[in-house]
From Swiss-Prot:
Disulfide bonds: none annotated. Coiled coil: none annotated. Pfam families: YidD. The lineage of its organism: Bacteria, Pseudomonadati, Pseudomonadota, Alphaproteobacteria, Hyphomicrobiales. InterPro entries: Membr_insert_effic_factor_YidD (IPR002696). This is Putative membrane protein insertion efficiency factor. One of its GO terms (cellular component) is plasma membrane.
Length: 119
C-alpha cells in the first residue's frame, strides 16, 4: 500500500478480512466447538434471510461467537442470549464488546448475572 520496502500493510489487510468473527485463539472444547459451529451455521444460512438489522457493533452473531469462544458454551451462550434480547426495539444499541474476562460475581449457577447493561 505505501510502497516502502518490507511494508506489510497488504498482508495484514488480507489476513484481517478473512472472517468477520473473532480470530483469537481459544480452547477447542466440545461445548465451544458446538456453540461456535451453531452460530457459524446460522451466519451462513439464516442470517442472509434475516438481513443486516442488528443495532449493535459487533453484530449479535459475532458477539455470540466471540462470547462462546472466550468464555465457554454456558457463560457465552447466556451472554449471547441476553444480547439478542437487548437488540430488539426498545433495547440498546451502539458499541457493546464482549468482556475480556468475567468478574467474580458471574458464576455458572447465576446465569441472570450475565445480563450486562449497555453504558
Amino acid at each position: 500500500m505505501c510502497g516502502e520496502p518490507g511494508c506489510r500493510h497488504e498482508q495484514t489487510a488480507v489476513k484481517a478480512g478473512r472472517s468477520r468473527n473473532w480470530a483469537g485463539s481459544f480452547a477447542k472444547t466440545p461445548g465451544r466447538l458446538f456453540g461456535v459451529g451453531f452460530i457459524r451455521l446460522y451466519q451462513l444460512t439464516l442470517s442472509g434471510f434475516v438481513g443486516n438489522s442488528c443495532r449493535h457493533i459487533p453484530t449479535c452473531s459475532e458477539y455470540g461467537y466471540e462470547a462462546i469462544a472466550r468464555h465457554g458454551l454456558w457463560a457465552g451462550g447466556w451472554m449471547a442470549l441476553f444480547r439478542v434480547a437487548r437488540c430488539g426495539p426498545g433495547g440498546t444499541s451502539g458499541l457493546d464488546p464482549v468482556p475480556e474476562e468475567l468478574d467474580g460475581s458471574k458464576r455458572w449457577w447465576t446465569p441472570w448475572r450475565y445480563w450486562s447493561r449497555h453504558r
